[in-house]
């Protein structure tokens, strides 16, 4: 919501960025430089051109935080119930002025009869390439808070929750198996791993997590700078994700590990493609 109201809100505090020592406390990336899901959520929220949903009024907007006008855009918003039945879809053509917030639509979720539902947002350029995407899993009823002065005096550092939102239906998501492959992409001065991943099932693949490991030891290779991670794939949806790494481990020992909330864990070989082919 801050992006939508950036000139009205008082600001955003990020706590905390990383751990100065091995710890289980919250972070965007830990002592070992392993990024958590929050890192990729924050990265997405900071896109200069960003499509987002607002929890307070169910609005969808395009936030342009750059100093450039961007024209000939298409914003797509789709509402699914928990069973992935499409309940609403809207496609809007728009232009986004520099430093602006452009309204797309409101999500009519009042008629959803499942306790959890999903909102899928995509922003495309005139060539049909994805500029921004977002996927939300939402409760039918949001958490409620105690904003009273008495509560503030007793607990000045946090706002008490009087009722928590219920997302327990996510535990009932059907298991899925993904098609995944990985290859090394070389270019002058850099070396990347490119992952192709697809959800061939009729079910949602929720919170897909990718990692690169040493096939000999099983240890995760860190740091790896992932383009995106902890994302979700709708039925039939595919994604190409690139990761940059710097490791002395021989290529033959590299493995891609794929897992997630409701995803069968698997390990794939990393093929070598020289000279930046298929980049």
Model feature map: region roles:
Residues 1-228, 233-243, 251-256:
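Carbohydrate-binding surfaces of carbohydrate-active enzymes
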Residues 17, 263-265:
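Residues that form or immediately flank small-molecule/cofactor binding pockets and catalytic motifs
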Residues 265-271:
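Eukaryote-biased activation of long, low-complexity terminal tails and linkers
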Residues 272-276:
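Mature N-terminal, pre-catalytic/accessory segment of carbohydrate-active enzymes
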């Amino acid at each position: 919501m801050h992006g939508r109201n950036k000139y009205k809100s008082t600001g955003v505090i990020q706590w905390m960025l990383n751990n100065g020592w091995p710890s289980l406390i919250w972070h965007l990336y830990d002592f070992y430089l392993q990024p958590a899901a929050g890192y990729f959520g924050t990265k997405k929220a900071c896109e200069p051109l960003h499509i987002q949903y607002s929890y307070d009024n169910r609005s969808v907007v395009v936030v342009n935080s750059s100093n450039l006008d961007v024209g000939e855009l298409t914003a797509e918003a789709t509402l699914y119930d928990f069973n992935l039945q499409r309940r609403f879809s809207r496609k809007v053509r728009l232009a986004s002025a520099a430093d602006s917030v452009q309204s797309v639509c409101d999500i009519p979720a009042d008629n959803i009869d499942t306790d959890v539902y999903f909102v899928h947002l995509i922003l495309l350029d005139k060539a049909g390439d994805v500029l921004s995407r977002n996927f939300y899993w939402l409760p039918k009823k949001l958490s409620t808070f105690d904003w009273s002065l008495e509560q503030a005096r007793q607990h000045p550092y946090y706002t008490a929750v009087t009722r928590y939102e219920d997302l327990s239906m996510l535990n009932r998501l059907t298991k899925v198996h993904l098609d995944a492959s990985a290859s090394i992409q070389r270019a002058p001065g850099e070396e990347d791993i490119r992952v192709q991943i697809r959800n061939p099932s009729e079910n949602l693949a929720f919170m897909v997590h990718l990692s690169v490991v040493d096939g000999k030891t099983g240890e995760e290779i860190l740091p790896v700078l992932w383009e995106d991670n902890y994302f979700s794939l709708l039925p039939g949806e595919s994604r190409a994700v690139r990761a940059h790494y710097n490791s002395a481990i021989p290529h033959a020992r590299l493995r891609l590990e794929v897992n997630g909330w409701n995803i069968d864990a698997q390990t794939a070989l990393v093929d070598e493609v020289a000279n930046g082919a298929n980049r």
